Regions:
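Transition-metal
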Residues: 1-122
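Gly/lys/ser-thr-rich phosphate-binding loops in alpha/beta enzymes
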Residues: 75-77, 140-149
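Conserved metal-binding segment of the jelly-roll/cupin
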Residues: 83-84, 144-163, 172
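Short helix/loop capping segments that flank catalytic or ligand/cofactor-binding pockets
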Residues: 90-92, 113-115, 154, 161-162, ...
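A generic local secondary-structure boundary/capping motif
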Residues: 92-95, 103, 140-142, 156-158
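Short solvent-exposed loop/turn micro-motifs enriched in small/polar/acidic residues
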Residues: 98, 135-138, 144, 152-154
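Extracellular structured ligand-interaction cores
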Residues: 99-102, 158, 164-167
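Double-stranded beta-helix
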Residues: 116-139, 167-180
Length: 180
């Protein structure tokens, strides 16, 4: 699959300024640019494919056209539960930044779910036993998902992508991940 370049959707709200254009090089005809929606399928401002076979196609239409080939992480079966370190911890222990992620649900099967964060206090012993018994999801928050949902996964949060979900993962520039 070829990498596609996207042009953002710009917003010229009253409180906008010139920094996005002057400092970050955003090419926009607006005098003041309030927001630059870099990866957007929102009807009020979609990103657009810039060049190539799909030139001019809105990002949402592109995703509909190419589907799962476009991008993503595909959840299948729970084999591990990632925990992403905070910047403070990762810098101290790993020598690089931690990782916070945002997930956009590209597609999912009916009844698909994501899991993140513990829903009650756990002892170290119970946590270990739940891993051994494959019952860890029983003590994690569960979120039923639908196509188009967006989730912010703060560093330090245990999480898992359930079966039948294809996500686009936008993450902090780090590959430091601990797995349970």
């Amino acid at each position: 699959m070829k990498i596609e370049k996207l042009s953002p959707a710009f917003k010229d709200y009253l409180w906008g300024g010139t920094k996005l254009r002057d400092v970050y090089g955003k090419k926009c005809d607006y005098e003041k640019v309030a927001e630059s929606w870099e990866l957007s399928t929102h009807p009020a401002g979609q990103s657009v494919i810039d060049g190539g076979e799909y030139d001019g196609l809105k990002f949402g239409e592109y995703l509909e056209k190419v589907g799962a080939k476009a991008l993503g992480v595909n959840g299948a079966k729970f084999k591990e539960f990632p925990v992403l370190p905070s910047d403070e911890y990762a810098l101290r222990v790993e020598g690089e930044y931690g990782k916070t992620e945002m997930w956009y649900v590209v597609d999912c099967e009916p009844g698909a779910s994501l899991y993140f964060g513990v829903n009650r206090a756990l002892t170290k012993e119970e946590f270990k036993k739940r891993i051994e018994d494959n019952t860890l999801t029983d003590v994690l928050y569960k979120a039923d998902v639908k196509k188009g949902d967006v989730f912010f996964i703060q560093s330090g949060t245990i999480h898992a992508i359930g079966a039948g979900i294809l996500i686009c993962e936008i993450q902090q520039n780090s590959n430091t991940t601990y797995r349970v």
